[in-house]
Amino acid sequence: GTITKHFTFNGSAFVGSAVNYVTPAGVDPFAGATNTYSAGFTWRPSGRLRVDQTYFYTRLGGPQGTALAGATAYINHLSRTKVNYQFTKALSLRTIVDYNFLSANLALLSADRLKQATGDILFTYLLNPGTALYLGYNNRYENLALDPEAPAQLKRYGVPDYMTGRQLYIKLSYLFRF
């Protein structure tokens, strides 16, 4: 019917092991049990507009075969919203907004609790098949910033409202035919 025509759903699951290379001082890299899940949907309200929403969850456990095997090294949550709009056959706009939250066990992972929000905008103009002009902009905000009282150290904040990266770029892609 109409709902299935405009919506599609997807998901995946992976259970296995992965190596933690980002260990704190005195802890060797180790293999831990990992669970990775994703779920999402695509909404196409019209032929020109497409909205994708995806949620990713990843958990890495402590070193396998040790007393810490049941511990959690980290849990990572990532939510991604992607919107594509096709103005004409040649001109399109894509935006992506990511929100990333990393909760780390400092005894097993050399990383602080991280909250990060990223936004990307990309205009694409297809001059002809094989040739495209791109104009893009991206922003990154984090909950980590330089501590004004101790400039060589990072300070943790609650929400990702400190800008840590910004880019504006233009790219021309041309296909050479021989």
Mark where each language-model region is.
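Exposed, low-structure sequence patches enriched in small/polar residues
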Residues: 1-178
